[in-house]
Structure formats: structure tokens, C-alpha cells
């Protein structure tokens, strides 16, 4: 069950009182940087896997060309 708008406002006020505006801004920035870093790592991982697949495919094609000669 999702909290309603009134409950979300109360939670936001409590969090703001606990951490303060500057600290909350820092936490948001850190969270944004963490998400950006995670997405970058996922993309690099995918690129690496695709690169390895390309190398394997090139080796297979090279073998096929040798067999045709």
C-alpha cells in the first residue's frame, strides 16, 4: 500500500528536520553520483562483453575462411 500525499509530506518534513537542507542536498548529490557511476559501470561491462563476443566471432570467421581455402 502506497502512502498518500499527506503522509509523504510528513515524511519529507521529518527528514528535513533530521538532516537539514544542506545535508539533504549533499545526500542527494552523493546518491546521484552513485547512480551515475553504477550506470557507467553497467555500460562498460556490456561494452566489454560485446567486444569479447566480437573477438570470438572474428576467430570463427577466420577459421571458416581458412577451411574454404
UniProtKB/Swiss-Prot annotation:
Keywords from UniProt, A to Z, are: Cell inner membrane, Cell membrane, Membrane, Protein transport, Translocation, Transmembrane, Transmembrane helix, Transport
| Alphabetical list of InterPro entries matching this protein | TatA/B/E (IPR003369), TatA/E (IPR006312)
Primary location group: membrane
Q: Name one GO cellular component term.
A: TAT protein transport complex
The way it spans or sits in the membrane comes to: Single-pass membrane protein
Where, subcellularly, is it found?
A: Cell inner membrane
According to the UniProt entry, its GO molecular function terms are: protein transmembrane transporter activity
Q: Which GO terms describe its biological process?
A: protein transport by the Tat complex
What's one Pfam family here? TatA_B_E
Q: What is the superkingdom listed in this entry's lineage?
A: Bacteria
Q: Does the keyword Transmembrane helix apply?
A: yes
Q: Which cysteines are joined by disulfide bonds?
A: none
Chain ranges passing through the membrane:
1-21
Family the entry assigns = Belongs to the TatA/E family.
- Subunit structure, briefly? The Tat system comprises two distinct complexes: a TatABC complex, containing multiple copies of TatA, TatB and TatC subunits, and a separate TatA complex, containing only TatA subunits. Substrates initially bind to the TatABC complex, which probably triggers association of the separate TatA complex to form the active translocon.
**What NCBIfam families is this protein classified in?**
tatAE
Q: What does this protein do?
A: Part of the twin-arginine translocation (Tat) system that transports large folded proteins containing a characteristic twin-arginine motif in their signal peptide across membranes. TatA could form the protein-conducting channel of the Tat system.
Name under which the protein is recorded: Sec-independent protein translocase protein TatA
Organism expressing this protein natively: Vesicomyosocius okutanii subsp. Calyptogena okutanii (strain HA)
The gene designation is: tatA
Amino acid at each position: 500500500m502506497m502512502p498518500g500525499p499527506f503522509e509523504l509530506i510528513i515524511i519529507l518534513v521529518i527528514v528535513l528536520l533530521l538532516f537539514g537542507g544542506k545535508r539533504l542536498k549533499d545526500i542527494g548529490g552523493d546518491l546521484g553520483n552513485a547512480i551515475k557511476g553504477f550506470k557507467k559501470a553497467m555500460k562498460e561491462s556490456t561494452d566489454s562483453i560485446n567486444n569479447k563476443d566480437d573477438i570470438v566471432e572474428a576467430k570463427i570467421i577466420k577459421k571458416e575462411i581458412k577451411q574454404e581455402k
